[in-house]
Amino acid sequence: MKEREFLEMVRTLPVFTTKQISAILGDYRYSKVYLNRMIKKGLIRRLKRGFYTVHEDPLIFATHIYYPSYVSLWYAFQHYGTTTQLPITIEIMTYKNGSFQNMEFIKSRHLWGYHRIKHLGFDVFMSDIEKAIIDAVTTERVPLDEIQNAVKNCDIDKLEEYTMKMDISSMKKIGFVVELAGFFLEKVYKKIKKDRNYVHFYTTEKGNKWRVVSDRF
């Protein structure tokens, strides 16, 4: 296959694999040699073993390296316009930890609450704002004031529905943060109020019905 023809084909894909190329070229070993030649020429990039792209914009391929996966946290808040911060790193929730250039993959057991958006003609999996709030609380990777601002711009009923899917400790933290933002998750509180255990969280607030205590003291 001629280089020009090859590049025109893979430009339509966010990510392509050695297996895909070998199906086209008809020889797995030759495909590996062919792809290595393309890398040396600077025409394609290796993302991880067996995965390649021709694109420079990481958002195009960020959610196509691991499945399932979706963009969340800072980048999601920026997408929804709830923060003025411009994130340098794209944080992706998936089933394992890892990093590549300006992407960080964060392990999560809760890979739901996201949807498909279009970016430069490609599919990208983006967190719902409500799930981004939950991810921000449970990972403790976003300042509380930023999370509270997102809470003020979300669907509270949907946030409560999502929160009810979480474990008791996470429910307490989320309920606590939502109340700081001026709202109250009644169903969540009814679920957790009989649990007498305290949970540690990155807050300076003391004494609250959610049994959340600061881990800074």
Question: For each predicted feature, which ranges?
Answer:
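Short beta-edge/loop segments at beta->alpha junctions of small alpha/beta modules
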Residues: 1-71, 155
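Short, compositionally biased low-complexity segments
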Residues: 38, 45-48, 106-111, 150
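Short polybasic/polar patches that bind polyanions
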Residues: 39, 78, 179
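Short amphipathic alpha-helical segments and their helix-coil junctions
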Residues: 54-57, 108-119, 153-158
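Accessory alpha/beta interaction modules
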Residues: 63, 69-89
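Exposed, interaction-prone assembly regions rather than primary DNA-binding/catalytic cores
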Residues: 81-148
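Hydrophobic alpha-helical interaction segments
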Residues: 118-217
